């Protein structure tokens, strides 16, 4: 079991806002994310520290959540300043349950226990 952190995925699988407009370093970045996550195991935990999806609503962000959900391990989501889709924790948990998204948890004014450690999340910007 290992703990990882990444931020600023800026996924746009449900919107037309590709990141490669910001330069060639962003070309095929979704494939690179998938390739690097393939090294993880199902008992690993990844903190995704905000700016997850360019979607403006939960529905518009659904393809991004499904992509992340399909990656190995548990993912803890923190709110970023571009995550306009972010609602209340209960609304998001209900949305995830309705769409059978099972590996994503919200980390916002709560804690997730990882072994002997607690991972806490709140807005820091």
Stretches found by the model and what they are:
Residues 1-4, 11, 111-124:
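Beta-strand-turn-beta hairpins that frame and shape the catalytic cleft
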Residues 2, 15-115:
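Core catalytic region of metal-dependent phosphoesterases/phosphodiesterases
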Residues 6, 49, 79, 120-123:
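Short glycine-rich loop/turn motifs that provide flexible caps or phosphate-binding loops at active sites
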Residues 98, 124-125:
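A polyampholytic, Gly/Pro-enriched intrinsically disordered region
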